[in-house]
Amino acid sequence: MRPRVLVVATSRKTRGGITSVVKAHETGEQWKKYHCRWIQTHRDGPAWRKLWYLVTALIEYMVLLPWYDIVHIHVGLRTSVDRKWIFAKIAKCFHKRIIVHFHPATEKHLFDSEFSGKIKQLFECSDKLLVLSPQWVTWINQGSPDKPGGLSI
């Protein structure tokens, strides 16, 4: 039996690169092949809407997680990491395999002192880390050289 994949990413209604990537995957045959399900964690708008999306995503995630094998987390920087870190920690508690697909807009805040702890924890709990380019591999290896999981472009 093929593994089932929960995809944790921003909403379909949010503009941006992560949404575009997940929508593209959703149209591919691998989406059905691996029984993928999109957990929408964030939507642009007022604070109440953002909180609503996060809370409903956490509830949906907790209900579905026991029936899935892999959690594929799409993450940018800053608040995206704060949200997605929660999902990764829960997945680890359930002994799920975790893929972190890292696509931030810039490396500027990648390893700021206030931010680096959480991003490193997210990377370290992943079984596989996907990045957008060879340059990202270099930056991540400079900031987190002991990454235990595989790092792929």
Regions inferred by a protein language model and the residue ranges of each:
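N-terminal subdomain of nucleotide-sugar transferases
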Residues: 1-43, 95
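Membrane-proximal helix-turn-helix segments that form the acceptor-binding/catalytic region
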Residues: 87, 93-94, 112-128
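Hydrophobic/aromatic residues located in beta-strands of well-ordered beta-sheets
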Residues: 5, 36, 98, 129, ...
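Short acidic/histidine-rich motifs immediately flanking catalytic phosphotransfer sites
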Residues: 66-71
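A short, histidine- and acid-enriched strand-loop-helix "catalytic/donor-clamping" loop
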Residues: 76-80, 96-113, 128
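A short, charged, and often flexible helix/loop element on the N-terminal side
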Residues: 36-62, 73-84
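Donor nucleotide-sugar binding/catalytic pocket of nucleotide-sugar-dependent glycosyltransferases
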Residues: 124-153
